[in-house]
Amino acid sequence: MKFTLSWLKDHLETDEPLDRLAEKLTMIGLEVENIEDKAKALKPFTIARVISAEQHPNADRLRVCMVDTGDGGAPVQVVCGAPNARAGLVSVFSAPGTYIPGKDITLGVGTIRGVESRGMLCSAAELQISNDHDGIMELPADAPIGAAYAEWAALGDPVVEINLTPNRQDCTGVHGIARDLAAADMGKFKDPTIKPVKGEFPCPVKVTVEDATLCPGFALRLVRGVKNGPSPEWLQKRLTAIGLRPINALVDITNFMTYDRARPLHVFDARKVKGNLVVRRARDGETLLALDGRTYNLDPATCVIADEHGVESLAGIMGGEASGCDENTTDVLIESALWNEINIAQTGRKLGINSDARYRFERGVDPAFMVPGLELATKLVMEMCGGAPSENVVVGKAFGDDRVIDFPVTEVKRLSGIEVPQPEMKRILTHLGFMMAGPGPVVKVAVPSWRTDVHGKADIVEEIVRIYGVDKVPMTPFERGDDARKPVLTPLQLRTRRARRALASRGIIEAVTWSFITKSAAKLFGGGQRELEVANPIASDLSDMRPTLLAGLIAAAQANADRGFGDVALFEVGQVFKGDRPQDQFMAASGVRRGFASSEGLGRHWSGSVQADLFDAKADALAVLAAAGAPMQALQIVAGGPGWLHPGRSGTIQIGPQNVLGYFGEMHPRALEALGADGPLMVFEVILDRVPEAKKRPTRAKPLIELSAFQPVSRDFAFIVDRTVKAGDIVRAAQGVDKKLITGVNVFDVYEGKGIDDGKKSIAIAVTIQPREKTLTDQEIEAVAAKVVAEVTKKTGGTLRA
């Protein structure tokens, strides 16, 4: 929600400085996200006159201009490429050292094609006050040379942007924001009575509402004989300041009412509407060319406004092109209605339309302001466009529901810990539009029609506390007896913490992604079941609970790549959902590596760059399992993985055939294509819930490390085995010979080719033998070696390579 300071002061009589108002807005729950002060940003830019503009000696499209900057000094030489640069032109000048916001550069003295340039003549786009970049700005001939441009152009009206929570629909208009500030002692609220505009004739257009649940109320008025042209300068500046494009007076009035009073309206060109209007559900096969230039396919779930020819408007979301108002409009129908919030939200998400009207209607508008909003809009139309108004046509209810809450004043202390005097409670609630009656400990509080979010006692406490001051809430620690146990993390919480630390220590950056993903992505990763669909998704592309963390991480990696950061390693630890039962929800640790983001380091390097591969993903997964306390000696790594992984470049980590702990490998190209991501991409995912808990020990102390005083011995073995034999089987066989003496078995060579029979391969291992009690003799070492050969032969069918 954006507004200017002067706009706010139309509704709030205040002398408070902007920084004080911004601080108070945040304190009362209307968080200020940004304040844009163009006067401050454009302070260095001045008004200047071009004295002469000569052809550049070395460029056809450049001119060498001598510019009078108004400082009393000699003219300044500026090289300019604008087609409208000419002698006598008054424009905006920036001197060296000035920051140009539209180009994100700081200007310096430069030489352009051999000619020195000591400044710049600016376009409106370079000052970020419009998108016009076809030429430098042209100011009136009487503009004061040397004056500050921002001050002369009256740009000293800061634009404030606030972040609204979904329940504060009343503050989607400047009027509601001013009311809150007045209640917080920031000024006096201006709330003049809206006088009805007397109709001069009956409205010839009738309105029928077929389904009152979709449209509880509808008001309409015809104004004849209007002259629709550009809106007044004050209105155009106000709309431009908040990022809206002025179109014409009638359309600008509806946009102004939307932001000023949180009352979306719609105007129809009455001459383009055939017959009467009906509010109904769309019919199968109906379409609408909307004001955004797009054609939408409608269905019976969509509420529309139609005439005898068909659909004219998407109710509460966007009007149709066919009945839109332009400079030829002479008769206008002004519509002010109430719409079903849920239907508006569902229709907007389904059609992918995010309009200002939808933003307000799906949150709920003030039902009692439906008719007064129409009266105020009629008054503005007559002031700007003239015309004769008809009488109002009102269908349905034009008022809000009466809500009176029995409120014990002690609730404020009970829920917030603050002692607020009862007179102060009444003052706050009264300024917010509530009515409080009764002297006793339980009072009656009447809720105003515009506060559709207030339904109970806790809501009233919230209103009182946020205005009184959340900074006054005392810090009260929970009481805990002397014999109370200190908090202890669960095994899963410990694994989660250790997994994060392990991955961070490997140079991977933690990311937090949505728990919701698209239906197509969910199906790709084995999800997409009906029970995992979100009943009321916040966006059409966030419809399903995620069966994996990888969908979000891959999207995040691609987003980084699209912005020029292709070498990225990301991880996330969070919940995944295989079903809607508690036992179908798991804690997972997942990660992606892209480009040169290998375990050797990130990005390219002069000493050589290593592309991330599946062994990096494997090492990441094993690091997580080791940190989580998995029995590493019992892990089995099986080639292959889920269908979304490359079949020849992936693996599955398991303990036995039933307990699959995770996967790693390269994403399948088809899966990446379906996700709209570029490859190759290395990924892993470990399910922390499936890691077996370590056996409990009688003491928490770790056993002492046993260091041997004797020299270790290493022996190399090369075995010829079938091609299908896994290296891990050979390693486990060798380790099992003597677990006290053999402290390490590593694979250092795999060979297939000349000298090896077809269907066979050679795997070489290094076995480390660590004596504990004495130095081993050659005979003892050879005995261990013989056992290694025998055990590997027995378990794998391999033979010692000659």
Swiss-Prot record:
GO molecular function, one term: tRNA binding
PANTHER family: PHENYLALANINE--TRNA LIGASE BETA SUBUNIT (PTHR10947:SF0), PHENYLALANYL-TRNA SYNTHETASE BETA CHAIN AND LEUCINE-RICH REPEAT-CONTAINING PROTEIN 47 (PTHR10947)
EC number: 6.1.1.20
Protein name: Phenylalanine--tRNA ligase beta subunit
Organism: Bradyrhizobium diazoefficiens (strain JCM 10833 / BCRC 13528 / IAM 13628 / NBRC 14792 / USDA 110)
Gene3D superfamilies with a match to the protein in the record: 3.30.56.10, Bira Bifunctional Protein, Domain 2, Ferrodoxin-fold anticodon-binding domain, Nucleic acid-binding proteins, Phenylalanyl-trna Synthetase, Chain B, domain 3
Keyword Metal-binding carried by entry: yes
Cofactor(s) it depends on: Mg(2+)
Subcellular location: Cytoplasm
Catalytic activity annotation: tRNA(Phe) + L-phenylalanine + ATP = L-phenylalanyl-tRNA(Phe) + AMP + diphosphate + H(+)
A cellular component annotation (GO) from this entry: phenylalanine-tRNA ligase complex
Gene: pheT
